């Protein structure tokens, strides 16, 4: 054991043994601490609402992986996976541990990530804030008892000090905020941000390194299972309908965001859900609304003096959130795992109005679209966006995947082949013209298409190959107008459709160039018109 490792272990032990380090508090005890410390307010729904301050989302430019000899050759370094040297990390780590040692109170949670016993990650989470500790308790997998928690010897430790601000010139960071992952020291170090989602996504990034090393696929997707045991996975970026479409009263939820896929099937990495809360209503999303009760956390929502919550008010952020244990939802699988998937749905919101509402993909096309991770940024969603812009996020979650994208794509291709999985590309965006001209595809029609795909009714249906993209489109789907199935038919100006489609194809091709020679085999067989 090196001197540094010995020192940090001693400091961690010292923090854990402090009389004012509260270990494995109950939800009620954490509520009392949150309210006593003025960290949040109680809402009429029973949930507490907390503010994350100026950081209302993740800080991807402030996230680093420590460049360590045993790990550095595996990481796909670049703008997303940024390196920081070990010496710089250790200096900052010790500063944070010394800072936390001076705090009057700390909060400690022990639990797990990964509902598969063979690959379960044992966790210790050390928090400066009580509401962050409740977040960890809600989002990670909880031990059955406090006694079980005391026996957990962690594989990874999260050290979260949101009120510690880094000095970039001294500490080697880019700003006051930092999220640093060290595989050698088995630590996620977080400071300078109160956005609790950094803890959840930090562990997800760790699992996205560790699982593929054991030939286990890790995925940014939601998952559910039908009455007959049929499993469906939903991949998609923000605004594509992933949460809405996977919340189905006739199917049980496995998980809403992070999963692994091993030799036994699919398993949830988490023990909770982190749902978007903007414009939430009981009518539109009853499962999520009903889950926001005692024990849940709301982030950055607007709460009136009487405790009522205005979910439509975005004065603090569009990214309001609700974090709650998965057992706040009635319709779940216990434990959170199931058999191999029968169906995979890739969701995209095409604001150009040219991608078919649903198409069946072969394995090569599936790998191509998985690597592309396409959706659209719409006018108004970001400053300066006045026209729809294509947005590509590798593996439908580029910020969370440390290895080269082909590692995940190749694993996916092998699993699709091995288990004969049906893969569909579903466009929840526009039809009959681009955003501003055409109209959004009806949610009713999208649900019908997804339900038909998941039920297996489209497996052996009749398909036609569209001349523009080379995608296989169902000739007909029950209760869905034929006119929208092939997008060119919904456009009054066919030449405009062809020009818009060709423009999008070129953008896909340009995006794919970033992967280099490693993906030539996928581009050759899986791209449009192939």
UniProtKB/Swiss-Prot annotation:
Major subcellular site: cytoplasm
Biological pathway: Carbohydrate biosynthesis; gluconeogenesis
Reactions mediated catalytically: oxaloacetate + ATP = phosphoenolpyruvate + ADP + CO2
EC number: 4.1.1.49
PROSITE patterns: PEPCK_ATP
GO CC term (a single one): cytosol
Example GO molecular function: ATP binding
GO biological process, one term: gluconeogenesis
Cofactor binding annotation: Binds 1 Mn(2+) ion per subunit.
Chain positions recorded as Mn(2+) binding sites: 201, 220, 257
Source superkingdom: Bacteria
Subcellular location: Cytoplasm
Role summary: Involved in the gluconeogenesis. Catalyzes the conversion of oxaloacetate (OAA) to phosphoenolpyruvate (PEP) through direct phosphoryl transfer between the nucleoside triphosphate and OAA.
Sequence similarity: Belongs to the phosphoenolpyruvate carboxykinase (ATP) family.
HAMAP family attached to this UniProt entry: PEPCK_ATP
Name the record gives this protein: Phosphoenolpyruvate carboxykinase (ATP)
Organism the protein comes from: Staphylococcus aureus (strain NCTC 8325 / PS 47)
Upper taxonomic lineage: Bacteria, Bacillati, Bacillota, Bacilli, Bacillales
Gene: pckA
